């Protein structure tokens, strides 16, 4: 179970006006401003749920995921995931989570996919029997057999994303964080990724938290959405709670953003 209660996160960033004189002045006298990325964020996600965590750019989605994965520490509030505080019990915590970023890679670009998998086996200290079992299962489910000996840089985007998902699941995590997992993929690759995620959730009861701007992904994969804007939770419910009188989810979401001035 994932529980966040009254979490706040603020970033201190330097500010200056454009121009050489302002840049020179900033060398001797820096001015700062504070950006409130998360403001009193609270929610609970039960085991096996598939949740869409959505909002416009700069809403606080990435900050939330980084706190949940143990990368960031909030100034206020509490976060408990399966009995662990992510940033305090990070080594133990990362054994139970998988993270996929659509625009970043955890694979090594100049070596075959299999070499990256072998290295991840050592990083996560996966036993050989468990590793072989998971690799065989993931290779079959994601159709990776012809890709394992190929250097990552030679893969298409769709092929690489399937390998990224497999890499994040080799250690059999209980929770999977997906950040734009289908960005840039063609229609066939998108369907393959969606089908796999649904099958994973059904067969292993894996908790899935999906952040994306692709509402087709949200509609196909999740039964609950949490909508964040300007660092605050604006809605926690279903797609129907937003859509109501609109023909499409995108149209309804745009109207929702306008009504909340975000």
Name these PLM-found stretches:
Residues 218-220:
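A short, surface-exposed alpha-helical micro-motif characterized by mixed small hydrophobic
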Residues 191-203:
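Helical segment within the ABC ATPase nucleotide-binding domain
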Residues 151-155:
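Conserved ABC ATPase signature
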Residues 176-179:
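Catalytic Walker B motif of ABC-type/P-loop ATPase nucleotide-binding domains
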